[in-house]
Amino acid sequence: MTDRTAAVTRETAETDVAVTLDLDGDGEHTVDTGIGFFDHMLAAFAKHGLFDVTVRCDGDLDVDDHHTVEDVGIALGAAFSEAVGEKRGIQRFADRRVPLDEAVASVVVDVSGRAVYEFDGGFSQPTVGGLTSRMAAHFWRTFATHAAVTLHCGVDGENAHHEIEALFKGVGRAVDDATRIDQRRAGETPSTKGDL
């Protein structure tokens, strides 16, 4: 099987980001964004998606969390796009429902080459551990755009920590499922068009 890894850096006046991604890893992760709860969520994504991930971001957290979260999403999405490559042999579609106590997240993904993001629901509290809750949805919108995937997500619950964590775990599981190689179509692109 081809090596499905990528390394992406992004440096702006607002952030300095470095990301590595191995789609065929075992969930190893090293994450440091300066936002503890966001680090925890990225670790959950890696662990439950079985991706080896490193993320380092030095951002303008004295302003707020927006630039850090968004730029990590840009870099991780770009790394995903590079790592998945021509998408030959992948399952392409996947869906997961993941609970965390009273909260449940629903995730549907199509590794289609088309950037679409839809989010249904909301978060029960405005912030969790230094992360503005709505930035969790914005992170996945940014990821979907730069990964060129279709991603439909929804959350329901009473505790924003649980809602956001279920969402990150759900995306990890769904993306892992969608990028798994189906030996019956190894080497083929999963599209009647022949290209994605």
From Swiss-Prot:
Disulfide bridge positions per record: none
Record localization: Cytoplasm
Pathway: Amino-acid biosynthesis; L-histidine biosynthesis; L-histidine from 5-phospho-alpha-D-ribose 1-diphosphate: step 6/9
Secretion signal, residue range per the UniProt entry: none
Family annotation (Gene3D superfamilies): Imidazole glycerol phosphate dehydratase, domain 1 (3.30.230.40)
GO cellular component: cytoplasm
E.C. code: 4.2.1.19
Molecular function GO terms recorded: imidazoleglycerol-phosphate dehydratase activity
Keyword flag Cytoplasm: yes
Catalytic activity: D-erythro-1-(imidazol-4-yl)glycerol 3-phosphate = 3-(imidazol-4-yl)-2-oxopropyl phosphate + H2O
UniProt keyword terms in alphabetical order: Amino-acid biosynthesis, Cytoplasm, Histidine biosynthesis, Lyase
NCBIfam families: PRK00951.2-1, PRK00951.2-4, PRK00951.2-6
Name of the protein in its database record: Imidazoleglycerol-phosphate dehydratase
Gene behind this protein: hisB
